[in-house]
Regions:
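Mixed-charge, Lys/Arg-enriched low-complexity segments
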Residues: 2-12, 78-110
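Short beta-strand micro-motifs enriched in acidic
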Residues: 63-67
């Protein structure tokens, strides 16, 4: 049981990969513009909370898949209930900002 958990954690995203995802989104400017906080790197990729927006998305999960592209989930978490608002699969690194802006309504830079 513990061995299976360790293997699933190893399959997840590393801190370095998580930092690279944030850098591809815009780094410090992205964090300031979107109110991103509470970053967590786990077996399903990087998850972080974002500020208020018109599409009621308050969490974003980004995972690197086997084709070296990203799968992005936009979530609404309320009272311990997780609802996936939208999912974008196969996003290239240079398209992460556009996918984020389109699905949250938040700008990532000035």
């Amino acid at each position: 049981m513990i061995q299976e958990e360790l293997e699933s954690i190893k399959e997840g995203m590393s801190k370095r990969e998580g930092a690279e995802v944030i850098a591809q989104l815009g780094g410090g400017r992205f964090i300031a513009m979107t109110g991103a906080k509470d970053f967590f790197i786990g077996p399903k990729g990087i998850v972080f909370k974002i500020g208020r927006n018109s599409k009621t998305v308050n969490y974003v999960r980004i995972n690197l898949n086997s084709m070296d592209t990203y799968d992005v989930e936009f979530l609404s978490v309320r009272k311990f209930k997780e609802k996936v608002k939208s999912t974008v699969k196969g996003v290239y690194a240079d398209s992460l900002r556009g996918a984020f802006e389109q699905n949250t309504g938040l700008r990532t830079s000035l």
